[in-house]
């Protein structure tokens, strides 16, 4: 992933030095277990840690060896032997490359999950704070992009909070599923390695053992992981699009913070564009682009082929780095979002009271009118107002069918905006609990 959409902690997780350090730990913990079982000398296991436990691996040297071997794990083991010496013969005993690669990937995805969960927590905190700030701020709810009935801006933010709370739960579940270790040998039968080695390495790295593997950990786990990232990205996009629509000039109910000295256009000095949320919409597409190849990786040949490898070398760092950046950016957008309650109220009033049509319909039916008649009476008064003529309440009061069913006072009461917000506390209690 390019630096523009990257943050240091997640980038460092995917750096070669980090990967080689995890590879070493897998090999060294395996040697510890083999020493305890009596397969290799205990002094050799200690020597491996003493001679290579704190070294900085020479990435260029490993690349140089790989140009000859055409095999990354062998290149690493060759370089490792340059530090360890004769005891290196006990490293990787009974193991296959995928034991190292898959277990390392599990560690990296587990750690990436921890970063992403922390990102979601920061976003949840921002959403909660702003939701309470605008808990009772009236705004128009839209269906199909068209004015429907009043909501509050706080409810919009509470909705996003509930969605990202689900995202957090999915990430926790994905972390759990991906956190598996497989050190079972060439085809998963433990023919040349004791299962206790796998158990020891898994415990040391905070993983579970894979119940049954082939040469690799089954890729349905990875498909579920990247699918989860795709869903989280889609939630980011949904919230981004909501903000982008609200920032449109003719709406302008909210907008991204526009900093001192910021420019919106090279040609038009007046422009204030929703560039952050537009950017987030694009980044969400990139995260989702990892989902299909991750699904296709599930169907490997027999006990394993290598078709998944090139895919994962790209999508694992790219999707986690991108989602980390996107979540942090979204938290910043919400934290600094500029809200215009006066424009929300202005937009609420644009349709001359039509947003109360359902209340009138229901009141008429409760007074004895059939639903079909009531709907026709309300609609015939609504359409002229929709076309820009007249006031809805005034037209209803003048309608003979409506006026003989409802008094003018009763009609007036139906246009009370506060009626729509009487359950806001209930909804907030459901979303946020007693907080």
Regions found by a protein language model. Give the residues of each.
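A helix-coil-helix interface module used to build multimeric assemblies
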Residues: 1-184, 190, 194-200, 209, ...
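Residue-level signal for inorganic ion chemistry
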Residues: 38, 280, 323, 374
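Short amphipathic alpha-helical segments with heptad-repeat character
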Residues: 110-121, 128, 158-161, 165, ...
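Glycine-rich cofactor-pocket loops
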Residues: 132-154, 253-271, 302-311, 335-355
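Glycine-rich anion/phosphate-binding loop at the beta-strand->alpha-helix junction
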Residues: 167, 215-308, 313
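A short, charged helix-loop
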Residues: 200-216
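Long, amphipathic alpha-helical stalk/connector segments used for oligomerization, subunit docking
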Residues: 286-369, 377
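C-terminal alpha-helical interaction appendages
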Residues: 336-405, 421, 426-433
């Amino acid at each position: 992933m390019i630096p523009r959409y990257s943050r240091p902690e997640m980038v460092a997780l995917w750096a070669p030095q980090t990967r080689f350090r995890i590879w070493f730990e897998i090999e060294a913990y395996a040697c510890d277990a083999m020493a305890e079982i009596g397969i290799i000398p205990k002094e050799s296991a200690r020597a491996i840690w003493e001679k290579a436990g704190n070294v900085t691996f020479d990435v260029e040297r490993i690349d140089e060896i790989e140009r000859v071997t055409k095999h990354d794990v062998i290149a690493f083991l060759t370089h490792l032997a340059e530090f360890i010496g004769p005891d290196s013969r006990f490293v990787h005993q009974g193991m296959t490359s995928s034991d190292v690669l898959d277990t390392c990937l599990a560690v990296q995805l587990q750690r990436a999950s921890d970063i992403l969960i922390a990102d979601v927590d920061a976003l949840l905190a921002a959403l909660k704070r702003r939701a309470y700030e605008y808990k009772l701020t009236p705004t128009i709810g839209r269906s199909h992009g068209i004015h429907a009935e009043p909501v509050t801006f706080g409810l919009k933010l509470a909705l996003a909070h509930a969605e990202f709370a689900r995202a957090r739960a999915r990430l926790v579940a994905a972390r759990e599923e991906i956190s598996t270790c497989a050190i079972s040998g060439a085809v998963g039968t433990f023919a040349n390695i004791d299962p206790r080695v796998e158990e020891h390495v898994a415990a040391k790295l905070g993983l579970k053992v894979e119940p049954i593997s082939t040469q690799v950990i089954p890729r349905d786990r990875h498909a579920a992981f990247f699918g989860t990232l795709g869903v989280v990205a889609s939630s980011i996009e949904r919230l981004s699009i909501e903000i982008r629509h609200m920032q449109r000039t003719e709406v302008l109910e909210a907008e991204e913070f526009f900093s001192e000295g910021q420019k919106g256009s090279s040609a038009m000095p007046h422009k204030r564009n929703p560039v952050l949320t537009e950017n987030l919409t694009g980044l969400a597409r990139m995260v989702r682009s990892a989902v299909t190849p991750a699904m296709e990786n599930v169907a490997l040949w027999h006990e394993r082929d290598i078709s998944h490898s090139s895919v994962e070398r790209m999508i694992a760092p790219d999707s986690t780095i991108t989602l980390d950046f996107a979540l942090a950016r979204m938290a910043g957008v919400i934290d600094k979002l500029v809200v215009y309650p006066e424009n929300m109220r202005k937009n609420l009033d644009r349709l001359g009271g039509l947003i109360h049509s359902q209340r009138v319909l229901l009141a008429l039916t409760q007074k004895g009118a059939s639903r079909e008649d009531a709907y026709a009476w309300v609609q015939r008064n609504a359409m002229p107002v929709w076309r820009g003529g007249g006031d809805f309440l005034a037209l209803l009061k003048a309608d003979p069918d409506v006026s003989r069913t409802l008094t003018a006072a009763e009609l007036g009461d139906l246009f009370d905006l506060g009626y729509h917000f009487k359950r806001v506390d209930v909804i907030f209690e459901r979303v946020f609990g007693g907080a």
